[in-house]
C-alpha cells in the first residue's frame, strides 16, 4: 500500500479515475455529527484530507496511470507501509465506505467504547469531546503520529449492582 498526495478536495476524483483504470485506491472518510442551526446533522468528512491510499504494487505502468490522474501531485514514499500501518489503513479505508459512528460511555474519566470502529482503537484514544460527539485516536503512519478524529455517540454508563446489596449475590 502506498500513499498518494493530491490536491485537497480532489480525493474522490482521483479514486474514481484510478478505479476506471482498474487500480484499487481509497480515500478514507468518516461520519460525524455536527450542529447546524440547532439541529444535529450527519456529515461525511475525509479522514486524511489530500491523501489517497493506493492498494496496488507500484509498477511503472501503475506509476504512469497515477501520474496521469488529474489532481495527483506526487507519491509520498516509494517504500511500502509496515504491516501494522497497512492494517490500520485497511481498517480505516473500510472498503471505500465511510466509517460510521461509534458508541461508548465515560466512567471514571475514561472513555469505554461499546460498539463501532473506535473499539479497535480504544487503547489509542487520547481525548474525547462529549458535546461535539467525537473521540480522537493516535495512529502512526510512515513513522509519524497522526491524530484521527471519529464520531462517537455517548451513552449513560451501565449500572453495576453493589455486592453489599441483597439482590446482587443472586445476579452474580
Give the positions of each predicted feature:
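Acidic-enriched and Gly/Ser
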Residues: 1-112, 127, 136-172
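A generic structural signal for beta-strand entry/edge sites
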Residues: 132-134
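Short beta-strand-centered aromatic/proline hotspots
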Residues: 120-128
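Short, charged beta-turn/beta-strand-edge "cap" motif at the junction between a beta-strand
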Residues: 58, 116-119
Amino acid at each position: 500500500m502506498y500513499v498518494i498526495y493530491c490536491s485537497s478536495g480532489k480525493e474522490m476524483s482521483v479514486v474514481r479515475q484510478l478505479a476506471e483504470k482498474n487500480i484499487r485506491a481509497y480515500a478514507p472518510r468518516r461520519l460525524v455529527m455536527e450542529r447546524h442551526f440547532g439541529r444535529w446533522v450527519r456529515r461525511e468528512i475525509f479522514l486524511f484530507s489530500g491523501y489517497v491510499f493506493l492498494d496496488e504494487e507500484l509498477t511503472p505502468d501503475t506509476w504512469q496511470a497515477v501520474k496521469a490522474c488529474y489532481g495527483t501531485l506526487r507519491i509520498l514514499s516509494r517504500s511500502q507501509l509496515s504491516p501494522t500501518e497497512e492494517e490500520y489503513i485497511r481498517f480505516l479505508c473500510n472498503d471505500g465506505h465511510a466509517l460510521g459512528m461509534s458508541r461508548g460511555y465515560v466512567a471514571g474519566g475514561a472513555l469505554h467504547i461499546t460498539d463501532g470502529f473506535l473499539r479497535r482503537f480504544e487503547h489509542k484514544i487520547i481525548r474525547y469531546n462529549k458535546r461535539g460527539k467525537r473521540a480522537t485516536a493516535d495512529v502512526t503512519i510512515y513513522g509519524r503520529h497522526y491524530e484521527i478524529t471519529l464520531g462517537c455517540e455517548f451513552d449513560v454508563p451501565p449500572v453495576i449492582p453493589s455486592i453489599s446489596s441483597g439482590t446482587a449475590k443472586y445476579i452474580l
